Curated annotation (Swiss-Prot):
Residues 354-364 have a biased composition (Acidic residues). Residues 223-294, 311-336 are annotated as: Interaction with Pol II. It is found in: Nucleus. Appears to be a stable component of the Pol II(G) complex form of RNA polymerase II (Pol II). Pol II synthesizes mRNA precursors and many functional non-coding RNAs and is the central component of the basal RNA polymerase II transcription machinery. May play a role in the Mediator complex-dependent regulation of transcription activation. Acts as a negative regulator of transcriptional activation; this repression is relieved by the Mediator complex, which restores Pol II(G) activator-dependent transcription to a level equivalent to that of Pol II. The keyword Cell cycle does not apply. PANTHER family: DNA-DIRECTED RNA POLYMERASE II SUBUNIT GRINL1A, GDOWN1. Signal peptide: none annotated. This is DNA-directed RNA polymerase II subunit GRINL1A. The gene is Polr2m. GO terms for molecular function: RNA polymerase II complex binding; transcription elongation factor activity. Dephosphorylated at Ser-266 by the PNUTS-PP1 complex, promoting RNA polymerase II transcription pause-release. Component of the Pol II(G) complex, which contains the RNA polymerase II (Pol II) core complex subunits and POLR2M isoform 1. Pol II(G) appears to be an abundant form of Pol II.
Length: 364
């Protein structure tokens, strides 16, 4: 066996079954384009043998896919026909179930014959509250279990065929059953309508009997709407008006002031309270301006305003001249010092001479 170089692993076998037909065709097109390049094929050591092998494999896989696809297309209309028949059978089953449910509803509505519409409605409400009916569905048979005895009328019973039977035989049987059920429902509906009688509302006997039979109706009293309850509660417990918001006032002080106002103080006490509030504001907050150190603004005539402007301009020019002279002196290093041309000796001479004059005057 020839030893492979280190780090080299043989390529894994390609699984063409996982790839789609479009991917296989794309690979086939690329391999054929490589095979048509003669210069590239001549440079290969195997002269394009691997490429030709892969092309053959791809063609075989594509042909196999096409064959499988053709077989599935042959069975496509059969599957569509089966689906349509299955849908038709399910529709027939649902129609039968609806007819049976309507039949059962008509049976339960005819528990008490020859009674008024009010009695029928009250019996429906009591039957829903006291004796609820239970419907049990087993296969295609339905049984009605109620708290009281119920007169059930004959209804068509449906039996299902085996799933292995043909659909063509199943459809006409169901259609005949549906027709029978619809005719029985119509006849039942007509009989129930004939049994119902409209009673006169002026007769007090039937109303009394209906109320005696159903005491739950007497206990029901008309309830007040919610907004009426809220209005009555608000009238009994009135809410005080909200206090106005005041700046720079603590909530406790505001509550105290509101309580004092409600008690009804004298005008003198209210003035005292205002004075204290102002003093508190002046001491604590900076909401007020400081007292003025100068007189407030005054109206001046045109002559006075011109004189003030000229004076201000002169002062400004003098200040500018002083600043310019100071800057020039600093730039030229000129230092202004006291000048004494006689020096210190002249001063001393004068002082000594004065002493001599004093001595001579003493001797005299």
């Amino acid at each position: 066996m020839c030893s492979l170089p280190r780090g080299f692993e043989p390529p894994a076998p390609e699984d063409l079954g996982r790839q789609s037909s479009a991917e296989l065709r794309e690979r086939l097109r690329r391999q054929e384009r490589l095979l048509r390049n003669e210069k590239f094929i001549c440079k290969l050591p195997d002269k394009g043998k691997k490429i030709s092998d892969t092309i053959a494999k791809l063609k075989a896989a594509i042909s196999e896919r096409e064959e499988v696809r053709g077989r599935t297309e042959l069975f496509h209309p059969v599957s569509v026909d089966c689906k349509l028949r299955h849908k038709a059978t399910t529709r027939v089953d649902t129609d039968i179930d609806k007819a049976q449910n309507s039949d059962l509803m008509l049976d339960t509505s005819s528990l008490v014959p020859e009674c008024s519409s009010v009695d029928i409605e009250s019996s429906k409400t009591t039957s829903e509250t006291q004796g609820p009916t239970h419907l049990t569905h087993k296969g295609n048979e339905e049984t009605l279990a109620t708290g009281c005895t119920v007169n059930t009328c004959p209804s068509a019973r449906i039996t299902t065929q085996d799933p292995s039977s043909e659909v063509n035989e199943h459809l006409p049987q169901h259609s005949s059953q549906v027709e029978e059920i619809s005719s029985s429902v119509d006849s039942l509906f007509i009989t129930k309508l004939q049994k119902i009688t409209i009673a006169d509302q002026t007769e007090p006997s039937e109303e009394n009997t209906s109320t005696e039979n159903f005491p739950g109706l007497q206990s029901e009293t008309p309830k007040k709407p919610h907004y009426m309850k809220v209005l009555e509660m608000r009238a009994k417990n009135p809410v005080p008006p909200p206090h106005k918001f005041k700046t720079n006032v603590l909530p406790t002080q505001q509550s105290d002031s509101s309580s004092h106002c409600h008690k009804g103080q004298s005008p003198a006490s209210s003035e005292e309270h205002r004075r204290r509030a102002r003093q508190h504001l002046d001491d604590v907050t900076a909401a007020r301006l400081l007292p003025l150190h100068h007189l407030p603004a005054q109206l001046l005539s045109i002559e006075e305003s011109l004189a003030l402007q000229k004076e201000q301009k002169q002062n400004y020019e003098e200040m500018q001249a002083k600043l310019a002279a100071q800057k020039l002196a600093e730039r030229l290093n000129i230092k202004m010092q006291s000048f004494n041309p006689e020096g210190e000796s002249s001063g001393r001479y004068r002082e000594v001479r004065d002493e001599d004059d004093a001595q001579s005057s003493d001797e005299c």
